[in-house]
Every structure is written in structure tokens, then in C-alpha cells.
């Protein structure tokens, strides 16, 4: 019987990408195939995230539930990867000695060797080192199902925002070689992928070495990927405003395949709080980026992150954030109350704002964002949108769903066209809007 692997993924798209790579690596080396049922698995991996509060406790809670599976099947391999693993290291094994493997984001390619060592020595294996970009040299070719795919172009972050653990868990910024990224995208194109999402903690900082020794910036990488005929859409996350260059803005003018949507986290609107966060820009500088971008893409959809209740945030600071939100008119936002991450400078800052006040601020902020989201969706009714059909609708398996350029899910009846539309670009007339989705009718070309 073929052995199986189960992976539970927490957090960002980078982790989703890494989880797919774990499956690829262990399929190539061990013949493992993916299962959605932990009880059926021979290997169980938790790919963790440490960005939010109590991340470690959530991991140990999950490990506690897996302990019984290990008791009933001593040959079961349990591993913890990702950013919590990078932070905690040996402490995970000390607290949960039944864990076999602990590995960081940069060492997932070493899983086959770690498994081998675990079996031969009987001892838990821990490797949370930062061997730069080495992991991409040991990856088997990507295998995908569907018309969309993630491609990691760089690892780590060197910005050291005062609240963020990423530089400590994923290391400094390191870019993949230019031709390696293009080769991966071309391989995905050959498998029928039409939409690529380029990933990095700060994609704007991409500086990939080319075959001739020159260095390619992010804008040049986008331009080359756009030359691949089968790739029809290009997305990317995450961007840091400090390095959102004029060259990248110019790419929006020159590359129609860049979608009409940008996720550009502001985090706050008060210059005083932005300085305390060590973000490296002012509210005015942030708005200047979007003003110049909207000169070349007037209707571009903008989403962001906002942290409410950063230590020392006053009513005036919060009002400055609300002013930024109203000035920009965000389409969507990931907004949350500040939670101190151990080991970061912000964790040591005095926080005298009551939780009730933070909660009220968050609710007010999110209400404005939600109004914007609904208004933009309502304005799409009566328009024709080109969508990439991703598969059956989650609401009705007899229907299909796709996604617009501005990241709206559209559900529609496929009729006689059926499943053959999956993976195709089609035009739909938007006939109804809901809180987070749209309803469309497919336009049949004569």
C-alpha cells in the first residue's frame, strides 16, 4: 500500500507554497502521496505560522491531539515545520518528545535526510538553520492541478519592523536566481497554469542574479514572465511600500497581464506610529505611491493590512489611520489588534490602551472597509468581467466559480459547457453582488 502524508498549514501563502514543496520532496524521495485525513497518514507535518498571538500554544494543542495517533501507531512520523519551529527549535521536542522532526522554512528540502536519520538513530531530528536559498536547488519539478499556482521568488525579510518576527524565523532577504524562477514558471505553464502568484515576504526587494552576472529587479522579472504566452495573469504578494519603485509602477503601464489589484500593506496611517513600527515611510509617501500608480491604472483595486492598538496609539493616531483609509478607499483589508510577538522590539513597549478601546477601534475601522467592499461589489453589477474558472462552486457543486482581476469570486451556472470550462478564461455578466462574492452569467460567444 502506498504511504501517505498529511500536512496542516497555518498562515500565509508562503506557507501554502512550502507545504506543496514538502509534498513534492517526499513524493520524489519516499513515494508519499497526500491525504486529507490524518488518521490515514504515515507522516504528519504541521507547517506553522508565528505572526499571530498564541501561535505556539495552537501548535502544541494540535500536537496533543496527534499524540494518541502516535501511541496507536509508533511508526507514525510527526514533524513540525515553519516559523514556530524556527522560533522554538529543540524546545518543541522537549515539550512533546513524540515529535520526530523539527525543521525551519529554509530546511524543508532536507526532510528526506532527516527522515532517514530519524529511522536509523531513533532520535528526533532538529534543523532550523538558514542555508540561504539552498532549498530551491533540491526541489523536484513542481506538479500542480488547476490553472493557478504560487511561485516563491525570494525568502526572508531584512526590514526588521519592530512588531514582526519574520526576519528572525525566515532569515534575511535572499533572492532566487532569475533563470530558476523563469524555468519554474515555464514548467507550470506547460502544465496548463494560466495565473501565477509570485511570493515573497517582500517581493519588491527581489534582486535575482542573471546568467550573465547582472542583477534583475522585480519589474524586470515580471516583464519576462509576461512574455510566456500561456501565462495570462500575474499576481504578487507581499509588497513593502518602502521599495515600491517607479520601475514597478511603470510595469503596470507596460504589462497588461499584471492584474488590476494590489495588496500593499500600510499597517497604520499615523506617522508617529509608522516610525515606532520602523516601517520606513510616512503616510504621505505611501499615498504618493498609490497616486502615481493610479495615474497608469485608474481603477486598480487596493487592499492592505492594518494593526490597531499598537503600543502608545492615541485617539489622534487612530484618526490618522481612519483618514488614510478614507483617502485611499481600500477595497479590502486584513485588520487585527496588535499582539506582541516574543523577541521583537515592540514586545517591550509599554501598552496602556485598554483592550475594549482597541476592540472598538477595530470594529469601526472594519466597518468602513466592509462598506467599501460592498460598494465596489455593487458597482460591478452590470459589468462584464473576465474570470479564470477555478472549479466547482463551494456553494453549489453543480455550478462553477472563477475569480476576477480584483480578486472577487464569481459563481455562475455553466450549463451545457460543464467542467470543460475549468482552467479557462471566460467572460461573465455580473448580475448580483453579495458581501464577498458575485453572481454572473456566462457570455457565450457566437
Curated annotation (Swiss-Prot):
User: Where is the protein found, in the record's own terms?
Assistant: Cytoplasm
Q: Which residues bind [4Fe-4S] cluster 2?
A: 157, 161, 164
Cross-referenced PROSITE patterns: MTTASE_N, MTTASE_RADICAL, RADICAL_SAM, TRAM
Record the organism.
Answer: Janthinobacterium sp. (strain Marseille) (Minibacterium massiliensis)
Domain TRAM: residue ranges = 378-444
Q: Residues in domain MTTase N-terminal?
A: 3-120
**Domain Radical SAM core: start-end pairs:** 143-375
Concerning its family, UniProt says: Belongs to the methylthiotransferase family. MiaB subfamily.
List, alphabetically, the NCBIfam families matched: miaB-methiolase, MiaB/RimO family radical SAM methylthiotransferase
Kindly state the subunit structure of this protein.
Monomer.
Give the lineage: Bacteria, Pseudomonadati, Pseudomonadota, Betaproteobacteria, Burkholderiales
Question: What chemistry does it catalyse, as a reaction equation?
Answer: N(6)-dimethylallyladenosine(37) in tRNA + (sulfur carrier)-SH + AH2 + 2 S-adenosyl-L-methionine = 2-methylsulfanyl-N(6)-dimethylallyladenosine(37) in tRNA + (sulfur carrier)-H + 5'-deoxyadenosine + L-methionine + A + S-adenosyl-L-homocysteine + 2 H(+)
What is the official name of this protein in its record? tRNA-2-methylthio-N(6)-dimethylallyladenosine synthase
Q: Could you tell me which Gene3D superfamilies the record lists for this protein?
A: Methylthiotransferase, N-terminal domain, tm_1862 like domain
This molecule's function is given as: Catalyzes the methylthiolation of N6-(dimethylallyl)adenosine (i(6)A), leading to the formation of 2-methylthio-N6-(dimethylallyl)adenosine (ms(2)i(6)A) at position 37 in tRNAs that read codons beginning with uridine.
Amino acid at each position: 500500500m502506498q504511504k501517505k502524508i498529511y500536512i496542516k498549514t497555518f498562515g500565509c501563502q508562503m506557507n501554502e507554497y512550502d507545504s506543496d514543496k514538502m509534498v513534492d520532496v517526499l513524493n520524489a524521495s519516499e513515494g508519499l502521496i497526500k491525504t486529507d485525513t490524518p488518521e490515514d497518514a504515515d507522516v504528519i507535518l504541521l507547517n506553522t505560522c508565528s505572526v499571530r498571538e498564541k501561535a505556539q500554544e495552537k501548535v502544541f494543542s494540535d500536537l496533543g491531539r496527534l499524540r494518541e495517533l502516535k501511541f496507536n501507531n509508533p511508526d507514525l512520523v510527526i514533524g513540525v515545520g515553519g516559523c514556530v519551529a524556527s522560533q522554538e527549535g529543540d524546545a518543541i521536542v522537549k515539550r512533546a518528545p513524540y515529535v520526530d522532526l523539527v525543521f525551519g522554512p529554509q530546511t524543508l528540502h532536507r526532510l528526506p535526510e532527516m527522515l532517514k536519520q530519524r529511522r536509523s538513530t531513533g532520535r528526533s531530528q532538529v534543523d532550523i538553520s538558514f542555508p540561504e536559498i539552498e532549498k530551491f536547488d533540491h526541489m523536484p519539478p513542481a506538479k500542480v492541478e488547476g490553472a493557478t499556482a504560487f511561485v516563491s521568488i525570494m525568502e526572508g525579510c531584512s526590514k526588521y519592523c519592530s512588531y514582526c518576527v519574520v526576519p528572525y524565523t525566515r532569515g534575511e532577504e535572499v533572492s532566487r536566481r532569475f533563470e530558476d524562477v523563469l524555468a519554474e514558471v515555464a514548467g507550470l505553464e506547460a502544465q496548463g497554469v494560466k495565473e501565477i502568484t509570485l511570493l515573497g515576504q517582500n517581493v519588491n526587494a527581489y534582486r535575482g542574479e542573471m546568467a550573465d552576472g547582472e542583477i534583475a529587479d522585480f519589474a524586470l522579472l515580471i516583464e519576462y514572465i509576461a512574455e510566456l504566452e500561456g501565462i495570462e495573469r500575474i499576481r504578487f504578494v507581499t509588497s513593502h511600500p518602502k521599495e515600491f519603485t517607479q520601475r514597478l509602477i511603470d510595469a503596470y503601464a507596460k504589462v497588461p497581464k499584471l492584474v488590476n489589484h494590489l495588496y500593499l500593506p500600510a499597517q497604520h496611517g499615523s506617522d508617529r506610529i509608522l516610525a515606532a513600527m520602523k516601517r520606513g515611510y510616512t503616510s504621505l509617501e505611501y499615498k504618493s505611491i498609490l497616486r502615481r500608480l493610479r495615474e497608469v491604472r485608474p481603477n486598480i483595486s487596493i487592499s492592505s493590512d492594518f494593526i490597531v492598538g499598537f503600543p502608545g496609539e492615541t485617539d489622534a493616531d487612530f484618526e490618522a489611520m481612519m483618514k488614510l483609509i478614507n483617502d485611499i478607499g481600500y477595497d479590502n483589508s486584513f485588520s487585527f489588534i496588535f499582539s506582541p510577538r516574543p523577541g521583537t522590539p515592540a514586545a517591550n513597549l509599554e501598552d496602556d490602551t485598554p483592550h475594549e478601546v482597541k476592540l472598538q477601534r477595530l470594529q469601526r475601522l472594519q466597518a468602513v472597509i466592509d462598506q467599501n467592499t460592498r460598494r465596489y461589489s455593487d458597482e460591478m453589477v452590470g459589468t462584464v468581467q473576465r474570470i479564470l474558472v477555478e472549479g466547482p462552486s463551494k456553494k453549489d457543486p453543480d455550478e462553477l466559480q472563477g475569480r476576477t482581476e480584483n480578486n472577487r469570486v464569481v459563481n455562475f451556472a455553466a450549463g451545457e459547457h460543464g467542467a470543460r470550462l475549468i482552467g479557462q478564461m471566460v467572460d461573465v455578466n455580473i448580475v448580483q453582488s453579495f458581501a464577498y462574492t458575485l453572481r454572473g452569467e456566462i457570455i457565450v460567444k457566437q
